[in-house]
């Protein structure tokens, strides 16, 4: 945006009459008393504010009614209408400045309130008093810890009961195996006993057979003895010259002795065989029983050792499982707390970023408003200089606002002679239409007498 005052032809202006020009804070008017038209200012003076051209809008939204100074002078023509137009434009500028200052004050108040509520070192929600919930939270934490402890104790008791049941089951299985082994040994001994019983029965049968045979021989011998005794009972004497006969008694006695010796020999042989077999069998049984007993004792001891080791292993596994459960629960709790803290940190960072963004935006808006204010002040000063002439002084004490005291903006046109004046108003602007500097340069000024 630019404010240019192009130089036209150098002309002489008669000395204007003395008048006064007053500007007040709001709704002020120009007091007309100047009857001189300054013809030294050519056409081409325009007011452009906020990137608007002649007749455009200001940055605050108020219309900027541009005006053009014609060749006949600044206040030539209808002076009252021109001054009223300038008065209205200046009043609209001041109203816009007041509105912007009020908006700026409102924003500053909001920023101050926000910093008082959510300033550095504070956090959302800390202005509330949650101390009355702390005992309830502690009580709930204690209840949770007690419940966790009781659950762990119940789990340990269940594990111990399961281990005890497993121990009893192992003992039952071991005793059952031992019982089956003893039954197998008893069955084997029963088979041996049956064999011995069969051998004994055979020997008894042989003994009975020999006894019957001996009884039969004794009976025959007795009958023969009776026959011989009956035959010898008569007194028949017969002398015969014959060979001596066989003595039957001696023969029978010899036969009886032979059979008795044979029976005794058989009995002794059977008894010796029976004793020998029984002794060897008893020795074998004793050896087997000793080996079985030692093996059974060793097996029982090994089974007891195995049961003890299995019980210890189950106890260690249960302890390991409970510790793993406790570790998992602790890790899950700490992970949940860490996630909650990270969520809070993320929310606070987002809130801080939002606050910084809003602060930057408000800062930029404040700078824009301040630039607009400075531009308005410079434009008012430029108006005063243009209205008052080269020697006119625009004494401005500011206008009533938050940061500046109230005062009167006035311009006094001093008496001067005819002068040839060439003036230029130079403004430097940037790409965003922001005014950097404003200068009013008087190129040439010469005083002349009437």
Swiss-Prot record:
What's this protein's name?
Keratin, type I cytoskeletal 25
State its role.
Answer: Essential for the proper assembly of type I and type II keratin protein complexes and formation of keratin intermediate filaments in the inner root sheath (irs). Plays a role in the cytoskeleton organization.
Q: Where is this region: Coil 2?
A: 252-390
Alphabetical keyword list: Coiled coil, Cytoplasm, Intermediate filament, Keratin, Phosphoprotein
Which stretches make up the IF rod domain? 79-394
Gene (UniProt): KRT25
What Gene3D superfamilies does the entry give? 1.20.5.170, Single helix bin (1.20.5.500), Vasodilator-stimulated phosphoprotein (1.20.5.1160)
User: Which stretches of sequence are listed as region Head?
Assistant: 1-78
Where are the stretches annotated Linker 12?
Answer: 229-251
Q: Where is this region: Disordered?
A: 1-26
Query: Which region ranges are annotated with the description Linker 1?
Result: 115-136
User: Extra info from the record?
Assistant: There are two types of cytoskeletal and microfibrillar keratin: I (acidic; 40-55 kDa) and II (neutral to basic; 56-70 kDa).
């Amino acid at each position: 945006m630019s404010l240019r005052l192009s130089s036209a032809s150098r002309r002489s202006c008669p000395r204007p009459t003395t008048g006064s020009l007053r500007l007040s804070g709001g709704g002020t008017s120009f007091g007309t008393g100047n009857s001189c038209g300054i013809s030294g200012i050519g056409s081409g003076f325009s007011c452009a504010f906020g990137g608007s051209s002649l007749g455009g809008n200001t940055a605050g939204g108020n219309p900027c009614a541009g005006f053009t100074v014609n060749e006949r002078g600044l206040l030539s023509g209808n002076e009252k209408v021109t001054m009223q137009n300038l008065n209205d434009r200046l009043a609209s500028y001041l109203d816009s400045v007041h509105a912007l200052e009020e908006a700026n004050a409102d924003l500053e108040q909001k920023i101050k309130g926000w910093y008082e509520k959510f300033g550095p070192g504070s956090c959302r929600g800390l202005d509330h008093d949650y101390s009355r919930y702390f005992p309830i939270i502690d009580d709930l934490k204690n209840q949770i810890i007690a419940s966790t402890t009781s659950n762990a104790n119940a789990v340990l008791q269940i594990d111990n009961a399961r281990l005890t049941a497993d121990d009893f089951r192992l003992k039952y299985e071991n005793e059952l195996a031992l019982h089956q082994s003893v039954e197998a040994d008893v069955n084997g001994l029963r088979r041996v006993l049956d064999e011995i019983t069969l051998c004994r029965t055979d020997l008894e049968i042989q003994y009975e057979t020999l006894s019957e045979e001996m009884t039969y021989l004794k009976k025959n011998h007795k009958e023969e003895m009776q026959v011989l005794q009956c035959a010898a009972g008569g007194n028949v004497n017969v002398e015969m010259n014959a060979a001596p006969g066989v003595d039957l008694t001696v023969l029978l006695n010899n036969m009886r002795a032979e059979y008795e010796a044979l029976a005794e020999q058989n009995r002794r042989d059977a008894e010796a065989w029976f004793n020998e077999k029984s002794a060897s069998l008893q020795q074998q049984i004793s050896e087997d029983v000793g080996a079985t007993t030692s093996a059974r004792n060793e097996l029982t001891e090994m089974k007891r050792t195995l049961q003890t080791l299995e019980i210890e292993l189950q106890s260690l596994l249960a302890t390991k499982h409970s510790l793993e459960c406790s570790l998992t629960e602790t890790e899950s709790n700490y992970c949940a707390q860490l996630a909650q803290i990270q969520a809070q940190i993320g929310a606070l960072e987002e809130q801080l970023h939002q606050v910084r963004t809003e602060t930057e935006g408000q800062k930029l808006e404040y700078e824009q408003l301040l630039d607009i204010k400075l531009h308005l002040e410079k434009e008012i000063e430029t108006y005063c200089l243009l209205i008052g002439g080269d020697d006119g002084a625009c004494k401005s004490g500011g206008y009533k606002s938050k940061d500046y005291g109230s005062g009167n903006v006035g311009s006094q046109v001093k008496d001067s002679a005819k002068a040839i004046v060439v003036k230029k108003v130079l403004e430097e602007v940037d790409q965003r239409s922001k005014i950097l500097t404003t200068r009013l340069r008087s190129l040439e000024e010469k005083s002349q007498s009437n």
